[in-house]
């Protein structure tokens, strides 16, 4: 377990950053390229551990994939061309890989076994395996398909109309991907609209997807046609530097090519509500995934209440929003965020525990947290618990804290932002 020591930043963070490729879009580009007909070229791919797990799984199923830094070429096999893997498909730490790939495996007639690391072994799979079983896939796992390893034998699926108890893009995507080869029209209805990268990218690959309110539908029997994909920067990775720019004194940062998909920009809405000083300049009007350059500078933030429909649009940003709230005047309440409990760690507990070690006044609630600003943070030894987003949030906190902060298990950030610490160092000069 590697540790990193963060020293306080005295002269602010200043400069330009090109944010690495969006993790959600990178995963999907590889998967959809693999089941499309023809050659897909992906530019701006995120070469983090999670997305590399997706590549290795599809290579194991006979797909020809060449990755060179942030450029990837996938020679698609079509929906019916995947081969039975000879080895166990290992997703590493990636919840996106296991859940979306389960939807694809559910419509293949061969046998496969899927597993991941210790964190994946604790994450609930039944929310995906149950609807896939209803469609006719044979899936088993520990505790009746609740936990990995999962065994899947697919094929001969029937479409379903599924009402999901949670707003989860992974659940929705798995069902839609299974529906590509199911008989009939597959429909998924959610309590709130979750991120829609799957729908946007399926359309880019030539699949007709219908959206009506909180319901998404597609008819079985459609083929994917290869297309080139330009991946914008990941707004979830940008969030750490957006908050850093707002809370670290004497800072001004320009974040380039940040993905601005409206189902993902809750962090932008929250910073606006907290009175952060920033500008957004759109750069690729009309693209299937919009992007912008964002300039942010040191701001006087105020506490707010965050809950309801916005939560699925910022669920991954809550750790760093909590940090921002420690530097805001007044109280910030985050609620309706039960999903935090089933992320890489229980992010309610880990955020509260680690920020408390740094001197923040913050308490856990059943569905979120209450943060009392403004707190003077003091350096300490903290732990990421192997969770990339906790690790990056603590690094930004360390820049602000008095004295040095040591982060244990700091290499976890490589899952989504392999160059994070180098970028942070460059901006402090």
Swiss-Prot record:
It is found in: Cytoplasm. Pathway: Metabolic intermediate biosynthesis; chorismate biosynthesis; chorismate from D-erythrose 4-phosphate and phosphoenolpyruvate: step 6/7. Pfam families: EPSP_synthase. Phosphoenolpyruvate binds at residues 23, 95, 123, 170, 347, 389. Signal peptide: none annotated. One of its GO terms (biological process) is amino acid biosynthetic process. GO terms for molecular function: 3-phosphoshikimate 1-carboxyvinyltransferase activity. GO terms for cellular component: cytoplasm. Keywords: Amino-acid biosynthesis, Aromatic amino acid biosynthesis, Cytoplasm, Transferase. It comes from the Bacteria. The active site is at residue 316. 3-phosphoshikimate binds at residues 23-24, 28, 168, 170, 316, 343. Its EC number is 2.5.1.19. InterPro entries: Enolpyruvate_Tfrase_dom, Enolpyruvate_Tfrase_sf, EPSP_synthase, EPSP_synthase_CS, RNA3'P_cycl/enolpyr_Trfase_a/b. It catalyses: 3-phosphoshikimate + phosphoenolpyruvate = 5-O-(1-carboxyvinyl)-3-phosphoshikimate + phosphate. NCBIfam families: aroA. Monomer. PANTHER family: AROM/DEHYDROQUINATE SYNTHASE, PENTAFUNCTIONAL AROM POLYPEPTIDE. Belongs to the EPSP synthase family. Catalyzes the transfer of the enolpyruvyl moiety of phosphoenolpyruvate (PEP) to the 5-hydroxyl of shikimate-3-phosphate (S3P) to produce enolpyruvyl shikimate-3-phosphate and inorganic phosphate. This is 3-phosphoshikimate 1-carboxyvinyltransferase.
């Amino acid at each position: 377990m590697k540790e990193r020591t963060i020293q306080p930043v005295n002269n602010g963070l200043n400069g330009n950053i090109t944010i690495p490729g969006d993790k959600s879009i990178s995963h999907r580009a590889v998967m959809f390229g693999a089941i499309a007909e023809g050659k897909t070229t992906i530019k701006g791919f995120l070469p983090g551990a999670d997305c590399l797990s997706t590549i290795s799984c599809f290579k194991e199923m006979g797909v020809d994939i060449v990755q060179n830094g942030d450029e990837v070429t996938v020679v698609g096999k079509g929906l019916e061309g995947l081969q039975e893997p000879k080895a166990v498909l290992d997703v590493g730490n990636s919840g996106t890989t296991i859940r979306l790939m389960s939807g694809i495996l559910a419509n293949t007639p061969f046998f496969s076994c899927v597993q991941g690391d210790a964190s994946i072994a604790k994450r609930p799979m039944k929310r995906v395996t149950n609807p896939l079983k209803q469609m006719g896939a044979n899936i088993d796992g520990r505790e009746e398909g609740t936990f990995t390893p999962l065994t899947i034998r697919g094929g001969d699926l029937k479409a379903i109309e599924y009402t999901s108890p949670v707003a989860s893009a992974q659940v929705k995507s798995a069902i839609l991907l299974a529906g590509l080869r199911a008989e009939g029209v597959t429909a998924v209805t959610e309590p709130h609209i979750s991120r829609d990268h799957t729908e946007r990218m399926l359309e880019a690959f030539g699949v007709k997807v219908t959206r009506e309110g909180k319901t998404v539908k597609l008819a079985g029997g459609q083929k994917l046609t290869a297309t080139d994909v330009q991946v914008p920067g990941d707004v979830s990775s940008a969030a750490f530097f957006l908050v850093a720019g707002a809370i670290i004194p004497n800072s001004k940062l320009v974040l380039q090519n940040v993905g601005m998909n409206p189902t993902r920009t809750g962090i932008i809405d929250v910073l606006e509500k907290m009175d952060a000083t920033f500008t957004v300049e759109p750069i690729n009007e009309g693209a299937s995934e919009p992007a912008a350059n964002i300039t942010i500078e040191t701001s006087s933030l105020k506490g707010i209440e965050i809950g309801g429909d916005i939560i699925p649009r910022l669920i991954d940003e809550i750790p760093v929003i909590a940090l921002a709230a420690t530097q805001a005047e007044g109280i910030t309440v985050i609620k309706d965020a039960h999903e935090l409990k089933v992320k890489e760690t229980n992010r309610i507990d880990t955020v509260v525990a680690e920020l408390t070690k740094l001197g923040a006044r913050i308490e856990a609630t059943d569905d979120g947290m209450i943060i009392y600003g403004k707190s003077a943070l003091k350096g300490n030894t903290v732990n990421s618990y192997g969770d990339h987003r906790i690790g990056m949030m603590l690094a930004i906190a360390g820049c602000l804290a008095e004295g040095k902060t040591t982060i244990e298990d700091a290499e976890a950030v490589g899952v989504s932002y392999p160059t994070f610490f180098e970028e942070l160092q460059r901006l402090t000069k």
